[in-house]
Design a protein with these regions (language model features):
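Glycosyltransferase catalytic domains, chiefly GT-A lineage
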Residues: 1-242
Length: 242
């Protein structure tokens, strides 16, 4: 498993990663590698807790980050730096031949991800997702823009190191390096750099610029919440969101 955590001035992604790694160990019993720009903070702030990681890889900070609005429930928000480009380089950074990459806020509560290692496809990613609420109608997770290409969640991916996935991640890196061009070509108006968009574009290209079957689905079901929601409690296998 690979977790990527880069702190900004208010959000402690390292602490999220530590919590996530503990759940991964409990439910999946897999080694966990942390990739981070915030290595010094990890060493100074989490001297003992960092031992939950089997390996820590320090990477140089990216100076070309965008910013976004972070919300903490309905009433509190901050405009903060969004350091999320490291995922585009994960093929070269992972120490594993078979890798699951998770966002640090993905809550692992069962062993369904182990099925990734017992199937034949070399690249898996979620396309279909479900809101934990029953009242929201969120269209942005259907396509990257209205009437645009299909949306895929870079939140959670699995890949094996093969010639095909090497080509895919080379394309990911190319799109990242030329993001302004692809953003314009695919009519993306958001000022936020999103890995979801990059992965969705790359999948569209490898499918021959049409819908196709290059990307197979991760096992299980992906549920999501909004940052306007509030997590009331979370224990071993139950959570409550308001």
């Amino acid at each position: 498993m690979v977790l990527i955590a880069n702190n900004n001035e208010k959000v402690d992604y390292l602490l999220q990663a530590i919590y996530s790694a503990k759940r991964i160990k409990r439910y999946l019993n897999l080694p966990v590698t942390l990739i981070t720009e915030s290595y010094d903070t990890l060493i100074s702030r989490y001297t003992t807790k960092k031992d939950v990681f089997d390996k820590v890889i320090s990477v140089s900070p990216n100076t070309n980050n965008t910013s976004k609005i972070y919300r903490d429930g309905q009433d509190v928000s901050f405009n903060l730096e969004f350091k999320n480009s490291t995922r585009c380089l994960v093929y070269d950074l992972t120490p594993y031949e078979e890798t699951i990459v998770l966002d640090t806020d993905v809550i692992v509560s069962n062993d369904v991800f182990l099925k990734c290692f017992d199937q034949m496809h070399d690249f898996l990613i979620y396309k279909t997702s479900f809101d934990v609420s029953s009242y929201r109608q969120i269209k942005e997770f259907k396509s990257i823009v209205d009437q645009g290409v299909d949306f895929y969640w870079a939140t959670c991916i699995f890949f094996r190191k093969t010639d095909l996935t090497r080509m895919f991640f080379d394309l990911i890196e190319h799109i990242y390096e030329n993001y302004l061009h692809y953003k314009t070509h695919y009519y993306i108006t958001s000022g936020i750099f999103r890995n979801d968009f990059v992965f969705s574009i790359a999948i569209h290209i490898l499918n021959g610029f049409q819908s196709g079957d290059f990307a197979k689905s991760m096992p299980g079901t992906l549920y999501f919440s909004s940052d306007k929601d509030e997590l009331i409690y979370l224990n071993d296998n139950k959570l409550a969101i308001l």
